[in-house]
Regions:
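Multi-pass membrane proteins that catalyze or facilitate reactions on polyprenyl-/lipid-phosphate substrates
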Residues: 1-310
C-alpha cells in the first residue's frame, strides 16, 4: 500500500476512535458511537473480503442484542449509507489510477464508437456487469429486506456459497483481466444479483463466478473491487436521496461519521491484505471462516442462546 494511503487510513481510524470516545452526536437510547465504530470496522473488513458484509452487519447486532437498528429502520438506512460511503471511498482511493484510466478509456471508446484496447473492454464489462444488480437493488430492496436476512438464513447462505467458492477456486487460472469476454462480463454481472441476499457476499459471488470462468485469483479480486465502485456509488445515491428527502433521524450524525471513517480506514487495509494474500495463496481460509461462522450461528440458535430471527 502506498504510504500516503496507509497514513490516511491510520488518521481516519484514529479520528473515528476519538469521536467515539467523545460521544459526538450521540443520543441516549440510540446506537452509540462505539457501536457505530464496531460496525464500521466490520463493514470495512467484510465488504471487501468474500465473507458477506450484509450478513455481518446483521450478526454483530444479533450477537450483541442491539435492538435499536431493528426497531428503527429509518436510522438503519441512514447509517447504512454512511458505511457504504466509507468503503466506496476506500476502493476509489486505492484504485484511483485504475479508475481514471478506465473512465478515460470508456469515454474514448464512446467518441470513436468502437473498442480497441483492453482498458476500453474492461471498462465496458464493468458497466455491463453493474446493470443486473442495480436493477434488482432498486426495485427489489424492500422484498429482500422483508424476507431475507434472518440468522438461520445467513447460516445457509454462508455455507452454500462458501462451498461454491471452494469449488470455483480449484479451477485453472487461464485468464487475466485482459482475457475477459462479453459473456464473462454478463455472467459476473448476473451473479451479483445473488449478492443482495445476506450471507452470499458481493465480492464472494463475483470472485466465485470469475474463478469458474477461468480468471486468476488476483484478476478475479481486482475485477470484483472495480465492480464495487459503480454499484456502491449508485446505491449511495439512491438511498442517500431517500434519506435526504426524509431528513436525518435524531442521533444519526455522530454514528454516521464514526462508522463511515472506520469503514474507509479498515477497507483500505482489507483491500491490500486480500490482494497480497491471493497472489500467494488460495481462497480456502475464507471458505473455512464461512463454514465456521455458519456452524457458530447454528450452535447459538440450537442452544437457545440466541433466537433464529432478529
Amino acid at each position: 500500500m502506498q504510504r500516503r494511503l496507509l497514513y490516511g487510513s491510520a488518521i481516519a481510524l484514529l479520528t473515528a476512535i476519538v469521536l467515539a470516545a467523545a460521544r459526538v452526536g450521540e443520543q441516549p437510547g440510540a446506537l452509540s458511537d462505539w457501536q457505530a465504530l464496531a460496525l464500521g470496522i466490520t463493514q470495512g473488513l467484510t465488504e471487501l473480503l468474500p465473507i458477506s458484509s450484509s450478513a455481518h452487519l446483521i450478526l454483530v447486532p444479533w450477537l450483541g442484542d442491539w435492538q435499536y437498528l431493528k426497531a428503527h429502520p429509518g436510522f438503519n438506512k441512514t447509517f447504512d449509507v454512511g458505511l457504504h460511503l466509507g468503503t466506496l471511498v476506500a476502493v476509489v482511493a486505492y484504485f484511483w489510477s485504475d479508475i481514471v484510466r478506465l473512465v478515460v478509456a470508456w469515454v474514448g471508446s464512446l467518441r470513436r464508437r468502437g473498442i480497441s484496447s483492453v482498458d476500453e473492454r474492461v471498462a465496458w464489462y464493468v458497466a455491463i456487469a453493474t446493470v443486473p444488480a442495480a436493477l434488482v437493488g432498486a426495485f427489489g430492496e424492500s422484498v429482500i429486506d422483508e424476507r431475507l436476512g434472518e440468522p438461520w438464513q445467513i447460516a445457509i447462505f454462508l455455507t452454500l456459497f462458501g462451498v461454491l467458492l471452494w469449488v470455483a477456486d480449484r479451477q485453472p487460472e487461464t485468464r487475466d483481466l485482459g482475457g475477459l469476454t462479453f459473456v464473462s462480463g454478463v455472467g459476473i454481472g448476473l451473479s451479483q444479483i445473488l449478492s443482495q441476499m445476506p450471507g452470499v457476499s458481493r465480492s464472494g459471488i463475483t470472485i466465485t463466478t470469475g474463478r469458474f470462468l477461468g480468471l486468476g485469483r488476483d484478476a478475479a479480486a481486482r475485477f470484483s473491487f472495480l465492480l464495487l465502485v459503480p454499484i456502491t456509488f449508485g446505491a449511495v445515491l439512491f438511498k442517500g436521496a431517500k434519506v435526504a428527502a426524509d431528513g436525518l433521524p435524531p442521533g444519526s450524525i455522530g454514528p454516521f461519521i464514526v462508522g463511515m471513517l472506520a469503514a474507509a480506514a479498515v477497507g483500505l487495509v482489507a483491500i491490500e491484505a486480500l490482494l497480497g494474500f491471493v497472489r500467494r495463496h488460495n481462497y480456502t481460509p475464507f471458505v473455512v471462516y464461512r463454514l465456521l461462522a455458519a456452524a457458530v450461528i447454528v450452535l447459538l440458535i440450537a442452544s437457545g442462546f440466541r433466537e433464529s430471527t432478529f
